[in-house]
């Protein structure tokens, strides 16, 4: 018996190289299969050698620049057939594709990628998908890095569509599981007012352009719409809104939200004041616009030149883009997102503003020609169905493919054996024997254990009258019990009293504006309320409170009552803030120091508006938002007196 022949890598590679070139010329994989079967060695060695030979032939083709793209594709087709025949590795076609795309210029890469798109069904087959999906993803990402987002927009879109067709919807690599934003999408615009040309050219353009437009208009055409007055402030505020659309989390910050509201109101006011009704005045003009425009052109990035601002605001597509951004932002702010921070919550005022503004945005969308009503209804329908997508993302993006349930044989119900007599006992009573006389007696006291637990004999919670009887007696000023000896000062008693009040008294759940420094003060207040409601047969004289006899008892806690409103609990109304802001004027910074406003907050207020009255109003609003329920009339009066505004404080106290 002859020994097995030795496998020579160099010789095998040379033979595979010759066979590969013949296969490329004949467009047939048969020379490779023949060479593979005649060479000695195991299958793994021959596969690795053939993979190396294929990449070597590709290298020669790339170095020889006379070879066209079809020759590259022929070699890749041969490798695909080789994988199908089982003579080369499943990753070889993807390695060849990656080498070709890395070495060719972009114009030829376009043709190679067309081949990749056409064979998406091949890549998704069981033979290639698991072995090549990571290679294809890496290849597409490398290609996207080489392409320009502005000049190669179509090519970039084709790559994204290919990846969407290749991977299933639940593929983790293509999902934004943590709901992250593209923070690199920064809108660049002129932020220096000194470099602005809006104020210099506005009057000249208006005077020179008006005569030309009027002279060119025909008798049948509608009158030209008036130009929208644009200054640098409107330009800056309008494009600043893009930063909020880019990163919606900013809206949860108080001062950023105030800025967003102000800028949005001004931008939407421009859309509302200057409508595009004139575009529908003439059917002839509309038809000319449709025929002359040709194919629809999509711009992936806004143009922020100051000279284009007037034209952009008069363009229906531009308005729709901006208004649609508002609706998407509002849906994110109102929606339930799994990865939102616990602090990202809207208050009632923010929710109300979003609701009103959403209605305004839909109204403006329906007023934009052409087909405004149809477009608005379509957008509303799409955003409603988007809720299903949000729910799917919150659930971790489970697969839409339902797995077949495993076929299980029906389980036979097991027979229950009867309890033995030594456990249930004998006779009509059939007591349960626990193995001990005392345990047996306790277990069989009642046939139904649940009913036994509900018995009145097991009710150990005392009544309010019995538990608070001693505390009510001590609260009577006539008994002259010092505070340190009262039972409400006992922490153990206070803990049990709170538990009893939560189970038996409705006062425990009623909100109160009165502030208590300790648990004992709170319990004394509750004792007074209970004394008025409980029966009068308690062995004590009628309870006297500090309200009835101020001279005998100076107990301030019993004197206070929550039944009547006072200046301590009054909140500052919006009209009062307007009146105070008008009186403060430019001196609002003096009050800001006594309201403990930081320098950063003051700078934000100054940058948002140049009107001193509005700045004073924003100061009071920011203080009220920060303090919440503590922003009372008393606190504001104290701050006004400390700042030296005694006249304003006196007028506020009188109201």
UniProtKB/Swiss-Prot annotation:
Keywords: Apoptosis, Cytoplasm, DNA-binding, mRNA processing, mRNA splicing, mRNA transport, Nucleus, RNA-binding, Transcription, Transcription regulation, Transport. One of its GO terms (cellular component) is cytosol. It is found in: Nucleus; Nucleus, Nucleoplasm; Nucleus matrix; Cytoplasm, Cytosol. It holds the Pfam family Death. A motif (Nuclear localization signal) lies at residues 415-431. Residues 418-427 have a biased composition (Basic and acidic residues). Residues 403-427, 539-574 are annotated as: Disordered. An intact death domain is needed for apoptosis. Component of the THO complex. This is THO complex subunit 1. It comes from Danio rerio.
């Amino acid at each position: 018996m002859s020994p097995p022949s030795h496998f020579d890598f160099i010789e095998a590679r040379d033979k595979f190289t010759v066979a590969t070139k013949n296969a490329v010329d004949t467009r047939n994989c048969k020379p490779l299969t023949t060479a593979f079967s005649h060479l000695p060695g195991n299958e793994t060695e021959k596969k690795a050698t053939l993979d190396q030979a294929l990449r070597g032939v590709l290298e020669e083709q790339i170095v020889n620049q006379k070879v066209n793209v079809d020759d590259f594709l022929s070699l890749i087709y041969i490798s695909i057939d080789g994988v199908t025949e089982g003579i080369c590795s499943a990753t070889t076609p993807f390695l060849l594709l990656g080498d070709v795309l890395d070495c060719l210029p972009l114009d030829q890469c376009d043709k190679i990628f067309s081949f990749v798109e056409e064979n998406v069904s091949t890549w998704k087959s069981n033979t290639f998908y698991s072995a090549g999906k990571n290679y294809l993803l890496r290849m597409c990402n490398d290609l996207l890095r080489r392409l320009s987002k502005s000049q190669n927009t179509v090519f970039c879109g084709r790559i994204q569509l290919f990846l969407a067709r290749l991977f299933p919807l639940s593929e983790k690599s293509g999902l934004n599981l943590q709901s992250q934003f593209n923070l690199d999408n920064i809108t660049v615009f002129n932020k220096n007012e000194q470099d602005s040309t809006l104020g210099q050219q506005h009057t000249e353009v208006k005077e020179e352009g008006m005569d030309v437009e009027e002279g060119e208009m025909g008798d049948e055409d509608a009158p030209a719409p008036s130009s929208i007055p644009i200054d640098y402030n409107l330009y800056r505020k309008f494009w600043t809104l893009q930063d909020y659309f880019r990163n919606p989390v900013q809206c949860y910050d108080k001062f950023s939200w105030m800025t967003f509201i102000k800028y949005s109101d001004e931008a939407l006011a421009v859309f509302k004041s200057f409508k595009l009704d004139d575009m529908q005045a003439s059917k002839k003009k509309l038809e000319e616009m449709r025929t002359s425009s040709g194919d629809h052109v999509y711009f992936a990035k806004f143009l922020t030149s100051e000279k284009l601002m007037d034209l952009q605001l008069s363009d229906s597509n531009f308005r729709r883009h901006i208004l649609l951004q508002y609706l998407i932002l509002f849906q994110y702010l109102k929606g339930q997102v799994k990865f939102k921070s616990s602090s990202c919550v809207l208050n009632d005022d923010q929710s109300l503003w979003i609701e009103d503004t959403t209605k305004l945005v839909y109204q403006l969308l329906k007023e934009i020609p052409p087909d405004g009503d149809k477009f608005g209804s379509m957008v509303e329908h799409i955003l409603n169905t988007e809720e299903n997508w949000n729910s799917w993302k919150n659930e971790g993006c489970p697969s839409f493919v339902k797995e077949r349930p495993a076929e299980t044989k029906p389980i036979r119900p097991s027979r229950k054996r009867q309890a033995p007599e030594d456990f249930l006992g004998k006779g009509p009573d059939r007591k349960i024997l626990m193995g001990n006389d005392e345990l047996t007696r306790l277990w069989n006291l009642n046939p139904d254990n649940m009913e036994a637990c509900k018995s009145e004999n097991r009710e150990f919670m005392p009544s309010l009258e019995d538990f608070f009887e001693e505390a009510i007696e001590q609260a009577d000023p006539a008994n002259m019990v010092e505070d340190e000896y009262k039972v409400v000062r006992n922490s153990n008693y206070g803990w049990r009293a709170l538990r009893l009040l939560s189970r038996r008294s409705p006062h425990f759940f009623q909100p109160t504006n009165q502030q208590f420094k300790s648990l004992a003060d709170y319990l004394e207040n509750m004792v007074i309320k209970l004394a008025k409601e409980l029966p009068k047969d308690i062995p004590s004289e009628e309870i006297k409170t500090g309200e009835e006899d101020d001279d005998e008892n100076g107990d301030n806690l019993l004197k206070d009552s929550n039944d009547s409103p006072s200046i301590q609990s009054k909140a500052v109304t919006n009209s009062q803030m307007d009146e105070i802001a008008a009186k403060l004027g430019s001196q609002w910074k003096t009050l800001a120091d006594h309201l403990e406003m930081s320098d950063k907050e003051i700078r934000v207020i100054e940058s948002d508006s140049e009107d001193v009255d509005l700045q004073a109003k924003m100061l009071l609003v920011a203080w009220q938002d920060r303090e919440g329920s503590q922003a009372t009339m008393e606190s504001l009066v104290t701050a006004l007196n400390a700042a030296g505004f005694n006249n304003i404080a006196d007028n506020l106290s009188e109201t």
